Structure formats: C-alpha cells, structure tokens
Amino acid sequence: MSDLDLSQYGITPDTTLRNADPARLYEEAIHYDPTAAIAHSGALTIRSGEKTGRSPADKRIVRHPNSEDDIWWGPINMEIDDHTFEINKERAQDYLNTRQRIYVMDGFAGWDPAHRLKVRIICSRPYHALFMHNMLIRPSQEELASFGEPDFVIYNAGEFPANRQTKHMSSKTSVDLSFENQEMVILGTEYAGEMKKGVFTVMHYLMPKKDVLSMHCSANEGDEGDVSLFFGLSGTGKTTLSADPNRKLIGDDEHCWSDDGVFNIEGGCYAKAVGLSEEEEPEIYNAIRYGTVLENMVYDEDTRAVDYDDTSITQNTRASYPLDYIDRAKIPGMGGHPDNIIFLTYDAFGVMPPVSKLTPEQAMYHFISGYTAKVAGTEVGVDEPQATFSACFGAAFLVWPPDKYAEMLAEKIRAHDAEAWLVNTGITGGPYGVGHRVPLEHTRAMIDAIHDGSLLDAPKKTEPVFGLDVPTECPNVPNDILMPRETWDDPQAYDEKAEHLVGLFHDHFEKYEDEAAPAIAEAGPQLQAA
C-alpha cells in the first residue's frame, strides 16, 4: 500500500490509501462505515444504501464526433454532452475533496496482457475499494510500482447526488462515461456493481475495435483443455453452472474472444446470493470467507450468521470474491477457443425444451434475441410470466449495435467449429403455477453430457414449435422431460402458450430483421401442427 498524489484529478485529501490490503480495508470499513460488520464466515457485510441494484435509466455516454457513429444510441445508451459531463465530474471531485480519507484501487481489466486495460478507482467508501480489489485483476508489487498512468479512471462519489437541474439528468443518480476522456463519474448511487459494469462497458466499446469480441458470459475449461461459454441473463444459472467441480473456472460473467482464445475481463466474481446453500452451490458457498464482500444481506445480530433466504433489504443480494476463492479457478483466466457455446434461458412459460442443439443460424437468432422470462410480480392477481429479450444476453451493457457483436460471434463459431446449445433452466411440466423448475441436478447432467460429447452423439428429434433439435435421451436425465409438450397434462394448452411465446419472439426480432440475414430470421420459431 502506498499514498498517491491525486492533485492531477483535482482531489487533495488528508489521507490517500492506494491498493490497501483487505485487512486494512476491513479496519477502515468497521471504523468509518456504520453499516459494516464481520460475518460469521469472515466476510465483510455492508449496505449499499438506497440503491441496491444498477440504475440503467441514469446511465449516460458522452456524444462525441470521434465515437458517435459507433454507438447504439437509444434507451440503453443515452447521450450527455461533454460540458455536462465535466460539470458532473467537478461535482464528484468537489465531494471527494470533502472526505478526509480517499481510497484508490489500481488494477487491470483483461487477463490477456495484449488486451488488458489499466483501471484506477477513486472512491470514499472502503467497501468500494475492497469490492474493486476483488473484481479487478490485482497487480503484483512490481506491476503496481510501474503502473504509470491508467487507461480508465472512475470517480465514485456515489454518496453525493447529481443536480437534477443539470442538463440530461433524470434523477439524483447519474452514471456517466466518456470514451474520449477515458473516465467515468458516479453520483447518487453507492451500489458497487456500477463500477464493475462501467469497466465492462468500456471493454465492450474498445475490444471490438481490435477485432476482439467482448461477451456477457461465463467460461470454464475441462481437464482436456476444452472450453465452454455460458450466456444468460440474471437468474438463468450462468454463475452456478459455470462453477463446476469437474472443470476449471475461467470466469463467471465477462469475457473476450480474441484470435488467441478467450480471456476473463475480471479478477473476481459477483455472485447472486439469494437462497444460497452449501448443498446446491458448494463452490460459491465456500468462497464466502475473509476478503469477500457481502452486499445488502441480513445477518443475526448476535452470531453474525448470514441468512441467505432473507430478502427484506433486496432480492439482489450479492457476494464479491476473488476468482481464486473458487477451488478450481484457472489463473491466469485464459483459455483456448471455445468448443461449446451454451445459451441459458429461464422459460417461465414452461414451453421450451430443457436442452436443444442449435444450428449456426439458430445460434445467431437466439443470441440476438437473448430471451428469458420471469414471473411478473407478487401483486395479487399477477400470475403470468413476463418475457424479457436482451440482445446478446446483455443489452444493458452493449455499446455498439447488437448485430456487430452477433456477426463477430458468427464468424468465430464458423472459424473454430464451435457447437451451440440452448439450455432452459426454467419451468417444465406445465405452465407457471403448475409446472416446476427443471431440477438443478438434471441441468447439470445435461451440461455434463454436452461436455463429454454424449449429447452431441445422442439421437435427436426436431421439436415442431421452435424448430429445435432435441435429444431424445440424456444420461442421468429422465427421457420424459426432454420434449416439453409431452410433460403437459393438456397438450392444447401447451400449444396456445407456445404460440403466445412464438409471437413474442417475432415481435422482438422485427427490429433486427433489416440488418439480419434472411437465414437468421428464418431460423427463429415457426408454428406448425403438433
């Protein structure tokens, strides 16, 4: 740990702690943060304040002549002018100057030295520094000594609100990025995930410029060196399924695919912790120990034991820990070209097969669609699922238009003969309220069969509604759950629900039809007689 002169950033605190050790950050948090406590496991528990999740409606990107033609402008990437960005940056600097103690975390984004980014975090909460200590790739003492000027700087003044009267502001929260300045400013939210996703957004912009595909996915590697990618929206099982005791974890959330293979962007994991148990997710459960940050969790005031089932603060409880806290993590987080690409969906309608083989065209269709479905809510009378479509299984983080990422993925699939699969971790045996979630042990068995090649060789039957090739048998999985229509007591009700979902797919894909090749559009679901 060393002090750092921050005057070049307009910040001159009494004390600056640079790359402080977790033990020191624990002390700082306990001493200066009234929400901090040490859990029974040794992890640091903390509250993020009013915001317990990301604020996508408050994200802004500076519109600049050098980059404006690259960016997918719209509700995902809303513009801010450079002058307003500078106003917000000065507001953040002014706030940070009122703090006696400032924490700096320098680290890398990207395990491949040829593509990594030097990142500097400037913040006023010890927990934010510890969080990014976990999430960035931690430099060695030699690397820290020669770190030099960063490629990207985050000013985290999340305890201080934005001025709602400032141009382009929609609330007291503002998360602003300038690709030209290589800076990010956070105001009005203390949710640590904003920093993580800010780094990802920058990588999502810079990497495609180098012909490197950036992806919202997890990745793992078998003992023979075979690599699998797992794409999926929140709650589909991306983190759970990639933390496989029989495979090495490359990473759980953000990766890039270059001409040399895949590499993890991060040095840690940010796992959802609601309902966490040692029986279901032992790798994640056992990673929660000294050095881990537990965000917005309820614990017993006497024993300090965490209740993972208590969501009274938020459903979005999280654990942040270094990658090497996973027993079979691969360090450095790099692997070869993927052999299997697995798209995960949580289909709450109960109509999609639990596993199916995709053609390259179907892979592109489902990548652009990025479908999952969740229950609408807990209000009385609300019992229908809501479909969610998120391009590239991570539209919230895309910078370029989705078709750019899809075309890059298609090129890499063709160049490296990767197999593509669609795995439904959602409902089977009937509609929501009647059916049940596909048991995790069955989903794991399907993933195992993909990895050992038995599912590729298994006999398959084309499912008529979605046009997917469905295996008729899979080791350690009951055959009668593989065809979804056959699991419903009322086949006609299945047909009606499936037709409804097909219509939602079609409605969503219309916005991409002009850019997508006809073969990709035709690879989508088509209703036929059952």
From Swiss-Prot:
Query: What's any GO biological process attached to this entry?
Result: gluconeogenesis
Query: Could you tell me the keywords of this UniProt record?
Result: ATP-binding, Cytoplasm, Decarboxylase, Gluconeogenesis, Lyase, Manganese, Metal-binding, Nucleotide-binding
Q: Where in the cell is it found?
A: Cytoplasm
Query: At which positions is substrate bound?
Result: 54, 191, 197, 318
The annotated pathway is: Carbohydrate biosynthesis; gluconeogenesis
Residues binding Mn(2+): 197, 216, 253
What are its E.C. numbers?
4.1.1.49
Q: Where does ATP bind?
A: 197, 216, 232-240, 281, 318, 437-438, 443
Per the record, GO CC terms?
cytosol
- How is its cofactor bound, per UniProt? Binds 1 Mn(2+) ion per subunit.
Reaction(s) catalyzed by this protein? oxaloacetate + ATP = phosphoenolpyruvate + ADP + CO2
The reply to whether RNA-binding figures as a keyword in the UniProt entry is no
Which InterPro entries does UniProt cross-reference here?
PEP_carboxykinase_ATP (IPR001272), PEP_carboxykinase_C (IPR013035), PEP_carboxykinase_N (IPR008210), PEPCK_ATP_CS (IPR015994)
Q: What CDD domains would the database entry show?
A: PEPCK_ATP (cd00484)
Give the record's family classification.
Answer: Belongs to the phosphoenolpyruvate carboxykinase (ATP) family.
Q: Which PANTHER family match?
A: PHOSPHOENOLPYRUVATE CARBOXYKINASE (ATP) (PTHR30031:SF0), PHOSPHOENOLPYRUVATE CARBOXYKINASE ATP (PTHR30031)
Official protein name in the record: Phosphoenolpyruvate carboxykinase (ATP) 2
Organism equals Salinibacter ruber (strain DSM 13855 / M31)
Q: Provide the taxonomic classification.
A: Bacteria, Pseudomonadati, Rhodothermota, Rhodothermia, Rhodothermales
